[in-house]
Amino acid sequence: YLGSTDSLAFNVTQPSQVVISTSPSEIDRTEVATVEGMLTDGVGRAIPNRDLVLSVDGQEITSISVNSNGSFVGLVPIPPDMPLGPIIIGVEFLGEDFILPSNSTVVFTVFAPVSVTIDDLGPVAVGDEMTVSGTVKDNLENGWLDSHTIEVFVDGVLIGITSSQQDGNWSLQWVVPESVEIGNHSISAIAPAQGFYRQGSTDSNFTVSFHTEISLQVEGSYATRGG
């Protein structure tokens, strides 16, 4: 048998890895989520100077670049009307000749800040029934919160718990006890953290005064005209 040869061309590809170093975390509306990591090959060697795709819940939002040592940083602004709860931020390398594509994700949980108000309070006296009222809303212009728990404190002592209505208004009736001293007092309304809503609070003041009365005393039952 005479000798013979043959040849076959083939491509050698290597896997890639998008390694996100940012841990899952919480973020508020209007803040900016930062996602950091590295692009490496299958054995952890850096793959520098490539482009990656950044996405939120599967929707591409921008591209970011890998620097010369394989690191990347992606910034995701959270809109003021972002739906509350978990979102998935993805980083994807689309691959190229001889390098396979890869992707990775990290979860951020979106929260809303909460603002609470207390309506102006007039002076009251011991034994009077005082109405404490106000509003509660999130960061949106018409983001009034329904069925949101409000805790009311006087001088740091809890005096009652109430809940907001559909239009964000809340109120609490409180009878001023005899133990309250005459003078100025602080009052606070706190909306504890609830669901994906942060804690919100506000402070105000009111005055407790004495009840006064005027009594008239007439010395005689008769009066003389011109006398």
Model-derived regions: residue spans:
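Enriched for extracellular/lumenal, surface-exposed ectodomains of secreted and cell-surface proteins
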Residues: 1-4, 56, 78, 86-104, ...
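Interdomain boundary/hinge segments at the C-termini of tandem beta-sandwich modules
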Residues: 9-14, 106-112, 206-210
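Proline-enriched interdomain boundary motifs that mark the N-terminal boundary
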Residues: 15-22, 112-120, 211-218
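Short flexible loop/turn segments that cap and initiate beta-strands
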Residues: 3-6, 40-60, 87, 104, ...
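Aromatic sugar-binding surface patches on proteins
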Residues: 68-75, 166-173
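Surface-exposed loops/turns
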Residues: 29, 48, 68, 83-84, ...
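Beta-strand-rich structural segments
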Residues: 28-43, 74, 91, 127-141, ...
